[in-house]
């Protein structure tokens, strides 16, 4: 019985480290080939519009500061 356990253990260990039917051969380089050049925007082609600065689900950028380093705030209005 001990030899049967030893043989089944070796068989299970070998099954873990040998390629099975579901495994493929070695993988090739990624990407498989050179990428295609981008489409030129010539006559008859219109470039896509730029994405909106903000939209649904996006937070709009903060407004610029009224003054920053080296720029003084405007003087108060005189009556």
Swiss-Prot record:
GO terms for biological process: regulation of sensory perception of pain. Transmembrane segments: none annotated. Its main location: secreted. GO terms for cellular component: extracellular exosome; extracellular space. Residues 1-22 form the signal peptide. Keywords: Pyrrolidone carboxylic acid, Repeat, Secreted, Signal. GO terms for molecular function: endopeptidase inhibitor activity. The modification Pyrrolidone carboxylic acid is found at residue 23. Pfam families: PROL5-SMR. Residues 28-79 have a biased composition (Pro residues). P-A and D1A are probably degradation products of P-B. InterPro entries: SMR-like. Secreted into saliva by submaxillary gland. Not expressed in heart, brain, lung, liver, skeletal muscle, Kidney, pancreas or placenta. It is found in: Secreted. Residues 19-79 are annotated as: Disordered. Belongs to the PROL1/PROL3 family. This is Submaxillary gland androgen-regulated protein 3B. It comes from Homo sapiens (Human).
């Amino acid at each position: 019985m001990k030899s049967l356990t030893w043989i089944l253990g070796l068989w299970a260990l070998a099954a873990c480290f040998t390629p099975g039917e579901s495994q493929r051969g070695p993988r090739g380089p990624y990407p498989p080939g050179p990428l295609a050049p981008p489409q030129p925007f010539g006559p008859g082609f219109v470039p896509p519009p730029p994405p909106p600065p903000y939209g649904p689900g996006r937070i709009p950028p903060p407004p610029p500061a009224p003054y920053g380093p080296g720029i003084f705030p405007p003087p108060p209005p005189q009556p």
